[in-house]
Amino acid sequence: MFKKWSGLFVIAACFLLVAACGNSSTKGSADSKGDKLHVVTTFYPMYEFTKQIVKDKGDVDLLIPSSVEPHDWEPTPKDIANIQDADLFVYNSEYMETWVPSAEKSMGQGHAVFVNASKGIDLMEGSEEEHEEHDHGEHEHSHAMDPHVWLSPVLAQKEVKNITAQIVKQDPDNKEYYEKNSKEYIAKLQDLDKLYRTTAKKAEKKEFITQHTAFGYLAKEYGLKQVPIAGLSPDQEPSAASLAKLKTYAKEHNVKVIYFEEIASSKVADTLASEIGAKTEVLNTLEGLSKEEQDKGLGYIDIMKQNLDALKDSLLVKS
């Protein structure tokens, strides 16, 4: 707990320092400044959604490196200065980027407009495992609500709309351009939604076991059941009692696949799979991209299609 509050004080101090050194006037639109729109985004989905809207009309920065787990990441003074200098700062929610509310309160006039991409989306509560872990004070960051809304193609559309609205407000001269890009990308997300919906209807099984509670919104949208090994943060480990229940559940439901994510340790998933005679496969949370994915030029929609193909092994989808 002391470490958590110490971190928040450091963040607050950094923002105050940057604010004191920066321009105290309120930021204007991109055109009034005479340069391109500058948007800073926190982690990969926020970057992807924003880039699809802005394209060549602005510069979009990714704050958290794609190879870094974003749940417990905190900004450096350099990161804070980058946010301070931007026109817009796009983040998923205070339940994912838990440092954002403190940072925003600490900033003076002239900072970027903060854009909560999940604004207006009904968030689900965290898992029982998550609450149990935090009751014992074992984790510094609280995810009382599930922040993983971007993993539902339907809710991803809402995030794109939220981001678009703020971009248009900041740079109204390019309104038609941004809205055209947004509509085109949303159409692709709608096609992705149809693909998931059609596949889910063909599934013989509905449950799948994941490394952590990241796919609740996706499961709810398509009538599936996510069975998580741990809570909302991938570095959590289940209690012995929870793991024993999972083993029993997996055997009773003839589970053949345990899903894990590439940018977090797969140790627990590997152990469970070994003990029940299952295999492991990647189910990508899109919290960051691997170097291989980046080299291939893969995007949100590509990887969500890969996720669907991986899920077919558990759901026993009829051809």
Curated annotation (Swiss-Prot):
InterPro entries registered for this protein in UniProt: AdhesinB, Bact_metal-bind_prot9, Lipoprotein_PsaA-like, ZnuA-like
Residues making up the signal peptide according to the UniProt record: 1-20
Free-text disruption phenotype from the record: Cells lacking this gene grow slowly in zinc-deficient medium; this effect is suppressed upon addition of exogenous Zn(2+). Growth is slower yet in a double knockout with YciC. Disruption results in low transformability.
Binding site for Zn(2+): 71, 148, 212, 287
Induction behaviour: Repressed by zinc via the metallo-regulatory protein Zur.
Residue positions bearing lipid (S-diacylglycerol cysteine): 21
Entry's Gene Ontology BP terms: cell adhesion; zinc ion transport
Record Gene3D superfamilies: Nitrogenase molybdenum iron protein domain
PROSITE patterns, sorted: PROKAR_LIPOPROTEIN (PS51257)
Localization per record: Cell membrane; Membrane raft
Entry keyword set: Cell membrane, Ion transport, Lipoprotein, Membrane, Palmitate, Signal, Transport, Zinc, Zinc transport
CDD domains on file: AdcA
GO terms under cellular component: membrane raft; plasma membrane
GO MF: metal ion binding
Lipid modification (N-palmitoyl cysteine), residues: 21
Membrane-related topology note: Lipid-anchor
Function: Part of the ATP-binding cassette (ABC) transport system ZnuABC involved in zinc import. Binds zinc with high affinity and specificity and delivers it to the membrane permease for translocation into the cytoplasm. ZnuABC-mediated zinc transport is required for comF expression and competence development.
Quaternary structure and interacting proteins, as annotated: The complex is composed of two ATP-binding proteins (ZnuC), two transmembrane proteins (ZnuB) and a solute-binding protein (ZnuA).
Family: Belongs to the bacterial solute-binding protein 9 family.
Designated name of the protein: High-affinity zinc uptake system protein ZnuA
Organism: Bacillus subtilis (strain 168)
Gene giving rise to this polypeptide: znuA
